[in-house]
Amino acid sequence: MTRSYRGDRRTKETDIELILNLDGKGQGKIATGIGFFDHMLEQIMKHGQLDLELKAVGDIEVDFHHTVEDVGILMGKAIAEALGDKKGIVRYATAFIPMDEALSMVSMDISGRPFLQYGVNYSGEFVGQFEVQLVEEFFRALAFNSGITLHIQTQYGRNNHHIVESIFKAFAKALREAITIDPRIEGVLSTKGSL
């Protein structure tokens, strides 16, 4: 069974194409026109061991917001579609990841009940030209389009780059664990019988 997705999202603000393989080797190519965002998406790809081809063209001369949010929407949809009926997945995962002085926690439940709890304090508004508030917008879009309950909390940190990168790496590690198929799980991991 191949757990993959190929799709696109086209609006007046963005044009995005995506190919995702959940059971990959952490390979692919990402080009959104936003250097720091590409670097963070590469963390998800590499540390989540996902194969990801993503090309986005957006109105970044206006703002990065539309591109970042729409990539989150399409990635969330891709994860949901690639997971299919969710049979056999571990479902839950929590990861703590440090990056130098920063430590972040991501906990998730692939439940079909989208939610984002986001508790992050930054030392400023930007990493380079990238507004750090867009990190929350990205993960909200991803959570609500994937059906994932997602909790993100930074324990501490001073450097915005380190804080953001520890979040993306923690998300990647938690996602990798939660989507893993455990042969001991018959059907879906729920007393209701569905997710």
UniProtKB/Swiss-Prot annotation:
Transmembrane segments: none annotated. One of its GO terms (cellular component) is cytoplasm. Its main location: cytoplasm. Pathway: Amino-acid biosynthesis; L-histidine biosynthesis; L-histidine from 5-phospho-alpha-D-ribose 1-diphosphate: step 6/9. InterPro entries: IGPD_sf, ImidazoleglycerolP_deHydtase, ImidazoleglycerP_deHydtase_CS, Ribosomal_Su5_D2-typ_SF. It is found in: Cytoplasm. It comes from the Bacteria. Keywords: Amino-acid biosynthesis, Cytoplasm, Histidine biosynthesis, Lyase. The keyword Amino-acid biosynthesis applies. The keyword Amino-acid biosynthesis applies. It holds the Pfam family IGPD. Its EC number is 4.2.1.19. It is an enzyme of class 4 (lyase). It catalyses: D-erythro-1-(imidazol-4-yl)glycerol 3-phosphate = 3-(imidazol-4-yl)-2-oxopropyl phosphate + H2O. GO terms for molecular function: imidazoleglycerol-phosphate dehydratase activity. GO terms for biological process: L-histidine biosynthetic process. Gene3D superfamilies: Imidazole glycerol phosphate dehydratase, domain 1 (3.30.230.40). PANTHER family: IMIDAZOLEGLYCEROL-PHOSPHATE DEHYDRATASE, IMIDAZOLEGLYCEROL-PHOSPHATE DEHYDRATASE HIS7. Belongs to the imidazoleglycerol-phosphate dehydratase family. NCBIfam families: PRK00951.2-1, PRK00951.2-4. This is Imidazoleglycerol-phosphate dehydratase. It comes from Alkaliphilus metalliredigens (strain QYMF).
